[in-house]
């Protein structure tokens, strides 16, 4: 017997989307000029940590449900797992744009306090050489690229770790996708620029 699909009430909201709205309020505190600067940085960090765990737990569960032969629907809005994942990704894209704007604001407000984050292309030639030497000595020896191909299984990705995705050129002129682990236990998140006190990259 086919199950009857219930029509969602207009006042009902999907739990996952409701949670993203909550996390947006955390992000709003990071952008609130009435909140002390140090606390705003904390709110920005909490927002991202919350989002990482949300994707790890809740989105991971929805992805598992999508693999099931039975269509699973959320009991308040009648959304399928696939519909929920799409809605979550769409909402997250909007939040990412908002987060980028707030991040730039925070970085701008940190500069008068003597703390600066700088992009590599804004370094002088000498500073660039110093960081290239640092990369060659302190980072490159620990890098190990996992090539994505049909011949190899997709690499296992650890939770709450940072990975870089790169396109590698082959001798034949083609490109291959590689995933590079960037462990927090091996690499420093911030590298200070010796020639500019209080400046990091």
For every predicted segment, state its role.
Residues 2-201:
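N-terminal non-catalytic structural scaffold regions of very large proteins
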